[in-house]
């Protein structure tokens, strides 16, 4: 037993040594001191950061290699994450929470998150952060179609094309009541059909029509990435970061097409917060600082995820794989603060019109 204990102690010592050696050069002022406080906590609980989404696996790997602190994660969806935080309010279990920006603003408004300003906070645009740091955006992504050409003969070029009967039981997207991307899709269809945040019925009526025609194959609760990779989804409405990852990282290549709808689309900001009263606050702060550091933002970029820091360029090997800039000119601007205020109303309207609830 003593020999086993000695081996375990040696392993732990090695991990501690690796982590300490890894930060001889700080990513930001105060990193070493924060690490010293965090290393004695019990790991890190990161809510809604599924590893197949937004290149989170690369950030997990980078963080754990640098600090030797294990990350525990779940993949709930933005709305479900806020619900989870509310249920755990008197006994918080998460340290950080990640979500579509309107849900982050909602969590902050419900006093579920702590004020914390990570490194590079001043570089994040004012409209994409709470002034006190109760939430702040860390990346963006654009709504696109991803089409499996082995299952679909004619590539849809826009939202109206998806209403064609030839796409019967072909379209898959996420539930806007519980996921950020689902709500983003609702906003995108609204803008593409001439509506706005004061009149989201145009987009929801479109989704209701898509449902009524029988062209919706499934409305999912969590990310459909693995199902798409397995060839189970003909037309997937998702973010460009997922599309490029499927094409170039998962290796689907020319078997899929990525389409920015002709009528227009939107680019969605995603936010993260320090959970109020979380069990490992210093590890949470260390994680948030890592995400907003140049290194963390660079790892997003390597995975086709648009960093939030202005002027942050994609690596050359990644930039050349994006659709032409002319396609991205169809991306429309959204007032995200206002979007956060009408989310609940839009979710109820979608449930009523699309599902008849």
Predicted regions and their residues:
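Extracytoplasmic ligand-binding site segments that recognize negatively charged/polar headgroups
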Residues: 45-60, 72-86, 90-232, 246
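Extracytoplasmic/periplasmic substrate-binding proteins
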Residues: 215-277, 311-321
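Short, solvent-exposed beta-strand edge segments and adjacent coil->beta transition regions
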Residues: 41, 140-144, 267-271
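Conserved C-terminal helix/tail region of periplasmic/extracytoplasmic solute-binding proteins
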Residues: 25-27, 226, 326-357
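A short alpha-helix/helix-coil micro-patch that ends at or immediately precedes a cysteine
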Residues: 59-67
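Short, low-complexity disordered leader/linker segments with a strong preference
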Residues: 1-41, 357
